[in-house]
Amino acid sequence: LYELCVYLAEQSNSAKEESTQTNPVPFSTVSKDAKKAFKKIQKQYPVLRYSTGRAKPVLASHLMSYTGIVGIYVPFTVEANVNTDIADYNHPFDTCHELAHLHGFMRENEANFIAYLACIQSDDAYFRYSGYMTALIYATNALYDEDTKLYMQISALLSDEVHADLHEEDIYWEKIRTTKAYQTVETASDKVNDTYLKINGQSDGVKSYGKILDLLLAEYFAR
C-alpha cells in the first residue's frame, strides 16, 4: 500500500506540474474531454464503446454538496449528473465516473477504477492529475488507518501546489459539514444513497465506493 501511495504521489506531482490549467475549466469542456478520454481507451477496453450519452452539470450543485454526493447516475432517464461546485480538480474524475455508469458499469468500485484509467491515460495533464489525485486520496486514507507515520511520509512527498489543492478542498468541505443543514440532510441522503446502491445490486452500499483500492493495487503490481 505504501509503495502504491508513493507512486500516486509522484504521479500527482508530475501531472500538476505539467498541467496548464489555472482557472476553472468550463464543464462543457470537461464533458467533451471526458468523452475523448473514453474514446482513447476503447481500443484497449472495447467494452467501453457502447454509449452515446454525456455527463451534465447539476444546476443546484452547491445544494447537492449538503448531501455529500458529488455525482449521480439516473438510470430511468439515462443521465449522468455531476456536482460542479466542489474543487475543480475533481471534475474530470467525477465526470468519467458517471460516464462509466452510462457504459453499463453500475458498481461504484468499477466505475471509480474505469474513471481512473480514463483519466491517467488522457492526453490532458488536467485529467491525469484528477485521476492520480483521486486515487491518491483513496490510498492515503487507507494508509492513514494502518500507519500514520507512513502517511506523513507520503504527505511530505507532495508539492506545495498539490497541498494547496487539498487544502482548498478541505476548507470547502469544512464549511459545508459544520452547517446544521449538512448534518441534517447528509444523514438522510446517505441512507437513501445506501439503499439506492443496494437496490441496484451493490450489497455493500456506500462502502462499495472504497473498494477501488483493491483494483488500484492489482493494477499497480501487474505493471
For the regions a protein language model found, what residue spans apply to each?
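Active-site recognition of the HExxH zinc-binding catalytic motif
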Residues: 93-112, 116-117
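Active-site/pore-lining binding-face segments in mid-to-C-terminal subdomains
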Residues: 113-165
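Auxiliary, metal-adjacent structural segments of Zn-dependent hydrolase domains
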Residues: 12-84, 88
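Pan-zinc metallopeptidase signature
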Residues: 163-223
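Generic structural signal for hydrophobic core residues of well-folded globular domains
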Residues: 86, 99, 103, 118, ...
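Alpha-helical scaffold segments in carbohydrate-active enzymes
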Residues: 7, 36, 40-44, 117, ...
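Internal, well-ordered alpha/beta segment that forms a basic, Gly-enriched binding/recognition surface
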Residues: 1-16
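Soluble non-cytosolic domains of exported or imported proteins
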Residues: 28-32, 85-90, 102-109, 126-130, ...
